[in-house]
Amino acid sequence: MIIGADEANDRDIIARSASLYASYGLRRVYYSAFSPIPSASQSLPLRRPPLMREHRLYQADWLMRYYGFAAEEIVDGASDGMLDLERDPKLAWALRNRALFPIDVNRAPRETLLRVPGLGARVVKRILTARRHVALRIDDLARLVHSLDAVRPFVVTPDWRPTGLIDSASLVGKLASRGSRQLDLFA
């Protein structure tokens, strides 16, 4: 799908992708940010959409295909139907659904663990394997995950309880993307 060539918002694009997966049995949908060309139709926009939008759509698509998210869940809460470009869709979903967290890493089913920001499919598989033998502690989790700071506010272990972290107003700032801003070469 070409992103940004028309007025379609991210909600429409994700819903269309979900219908393509359901009705045609597609294994993957590709997204490409619109790139304007000189002497094009006047109905096409003159500026290209941010590449981060394409990236967020790929992340949302991944959540639908591998993490069990429904299309409505991903864009739920977005007033204009657009994904938040500042944070990934999984983190944005978790922040909108704070009442579901924190979850116990030693008891939660696979489907619930996959919804925790910072836990991917491989890490969840390792957690499920490890917790059969021993109750996981925060140090064990630190060895399994890429960034414990991203996971910590959303989980409970025998030696860690995030009292007040999940309801903290500063949580959004702490978990904000630390990446650099995309520069515009032709500005």
Predicted regions and their residues:
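Residue-level signature of tetratricopeptide-repeat
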Residues: 130-131
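Long, low-complexity intrinsically disordered regulatory regions enriched in P/S/T/G and acidic residues
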Residues: 38-43, 48-98
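Catalytic cores of alpha/beta
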Residues: 6-22
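C-terminal extensions
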Residues: 83-112, 138-187
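Conserved strand-turn element in the central/C-terminal portion of the radical SAM core barrel
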Residues: 1-11, 32-39, 43-51
